[in-house]
Amino acid sequence: MSQKVANRSIVFYNSQSPPSVITEELDLGNCFSPSELVVKIHAAALNPVDFLLQGFAYSWLVGKGPKGFSRDYSGEVVKVGANVKDFKVGDKVSGLFQHLYGKQGTLCDYLILDPSKQPAISKISPVGHPEYDDYVINASWALVFGTAYQALHNYGQNLGPDSKVLVIGASTSVSNALIQIAKNRMKIGTVVGICSKKSFEYNKKLGYDYLAAYDDGSTVENVKQIMKNNMGNEKFDLIFDSVGNSEFFECINDVLKDKCQNSHYVSVTGDKKLNYSNPRIRDSLPGWESIRRIGPFRKYNYKLLLLKPEATFAKIGSEMIAQKQFVPAVDSVYAFEDYSKAFERLKSNKAKGKVVIQISQ
């Protein structure tokens, strides 16, 4: 029996094309395989990486067809294949849909996925947020939470009450998730954040033990003063960079423990702050500092984190939200028809939390 519906998607075609809406007919009766399910999307969050990928979307490299935006989503399962075991029609779910220049993104009415290939999906629990509904909150966290979780867990470190972590870019959405995981779940003893002076009060409430300003004197010296005055000059077990920074490399031995102690410097962007609105390939290339990270020249443990979609972080994130241990940060919510305003908000670099587009209510 035909169950045809209209499926709207926000897409781009290449690096020069503006975002646009396409509408295609989708037959819910036969659009999925036995191993797939169909999610009716209620909300999806924007991520800066989408603009970066579009900036590099040269037609000769990625083809001329439509390419979907976004990865975070929340919604309701409306169809389930015969071989899908863990989900049923009516389940409210959220997750991360990983793709690279695929036609399907999450800014659409219906998302078709195979949970065995897209494992970062979990059932959502009631949130009870005073301002936003459950779908908005649950659309806002998978990518940033997963990134933060893997930064803290994927490199063989056993971080806990005696550990010390430095967060470069304390006000980003990824760092917002990281501080909540670090303090509320892992009970990490000392977390120092770097942010603007005006963000001190906000970040202190999240759980940072000490904050260093990047807009008041030398960032490096401000951190060293915290180490001297509050940490007994002990060095960090982990330096996490969520913005793109190179200030600490010249004095890495002064701030990061020796590599033999399994200390790590983990970055999600590289050594430079990327211009997501106008990305350039040369800004993404490794610099001379990379020589100190490889082979016999390696002076410290460095990782450029590329998020892997995993069921583990999706399950833990959902549990922490239900237990009030993690509150995703939402900056603003826009209707589907106002997607261009949502894009501009994210590009403004003024968003404090995720920018979410509500697909259906």
Curated annotation (Swiss-Prot):
Annotated compartments: Lipid droplet; Mitochondrion
GO MF entries: oxidoreductase activity
Key word Mitochondrion present: yes
CDD domains cross-referenced by the UniProt entry: AST1_like
SUPFAM superfamilies tied to this protein: GroES-like, NAD(P)-binding Rossmann-fold domains
Keyword Aminoacyl-tRNA synthetase: no
One Pfam family from the record: ADH_N
Any single GO CC term annotated in Swiss-Prot or TrEMBL for this entry: mitochondrion
Domain of life, per lineage: Eukaryota
Keyword annotations from UniProtKB, A to Z: Lipid droplet, Mitochondrion
InterPro entries listed in its UniProt record: ADH-like_N, GroES-like_sf, NAD(P)-bd_dom_sf, PKS_ER, YIM1/Zinc_Alcohol_DH_Fams
Family statement drawn from the similarity comment of this UniProt entry: Belongs to the YIM1 family.
Record-linked PANTHER family: ALCOHOL DEHYDROGENASE RELATED (PTHR11695), RETICULON-4-INTERACTING PROTEIN 1, MITOCHONDRIAL (PTHR11695:SF294)
Protein name: Protein YIM1-2
High-level lineage: Eukaryota, Fungi, Dikarya, Ascomycota, Saccharomycotina
